[in-house]
UniProtKB/Swiss-Prot annotation:
Keywords: Membrane, Transmembrane, Transmembrane helix
Entry-linked Pfam families: Keratin_assoc
Protein's cellular compartments: Membrane
Subunit structure as annotated in this protein's UniProt entry: Component of the oligosaccharyltransferase (OST) complex.
Membrane spanning stretches: 1-21, 35-55, 69-89, 93-113
First and last residue of the signal peptide: none
Taxonomy of the source species: Eukaryota, Metazoa, Ecdysozoa, Arthropoda, Chelicerata
Cysteines joined through disulfide linkages: none
Protein's membrane topology: Multi-pass membrane protein
Function: Subunit of the oligosaccharyl transferase (OST) complex that catalyzes the initial transfer of a defined glycan (Glc(3)Man(9)GlcNAc(2) in eukaryotes) from the lipid carrier dolichol-pyrophosphate to an asparagine residue within an Asn-X-Ser/Thr consensus motif in nascent polypeptide chains, the first step in protein N-glycosylation. N-glycosylation occurs cotranslationally and the complex associates with the Sec61 complex at the channel-forming translocon complex that mediates protein translocation across the endoplasmic reticulum (ER). All subunits are required for a maximal enzyme activity.
Native species: Ixodes scapularis
This protein's name: Protein KRTCAP2 homolog
Family annotation (InterPro entries): KRTCAP2
Any single biological process term in GO: protein N-linked glycosylation
């Protein structure tokens, strides 16, 4: 069952805070070995998707259905926040968060194009015809 964009934004924000707190609580376990540091980066990419969802849904709620999330500033801001949150756990988590987030962004964009149609509209030239000025 679908919820409104405002409710979805609040859910994504709450899940972001919950996951961020969980990463901080289990910081020592996430830094104990290299595979766990990679898991920390993966959790950081989940943070990225949650932040991006929250930002996009709040923009849709406040600016209307036709508003689209752009690469700059929304995606970049979400990526910086997720990488900073991952950096609070371990340095390696920053790199793996970036890699996993780029892959996740590709698949989210692919799903969005499939569901909603063309992602970025192409500019089409309108032919200019010479006619009488008095028309």
């Amino acid at each position: 069952m679908a919820v409104s964009s405002g409710t979805s934004g609040m859910l994504a924000t709450c899940l972001f805070m919950l996951l961020f707190a969980t990463m901080q609580i289990y910081k020592s376990q996430l830094t104990s070995s290299q595979p766990m540091a990679i898991v920390g980066g993966f959790l950081g990419s989940v943070l990225f998707i949650l932040i991006l969802t929250a930002i996009s849904n709040f923009e849709t709620h406040f600016f209307g259905r036709n508003f689209q999330t752009k690469l700059i500033p929304e995606v970049v801001i979400a990526l910086v926040i997720a990488m900073a949150a991952s950096g609070m756990v371990h340095r390696v988590c920053i790199t793996t968060c970036l890699i996993f987030s780029i892959v996740a962004l590709y698949y989210v964009s692919r799903i969005s194009i499939k569901v909603h149609g063309s992602g970025a509209g192409t500019a089409t030239a309108i032919p200019v015809t010479k006619g009488k000025k008095g028309k």
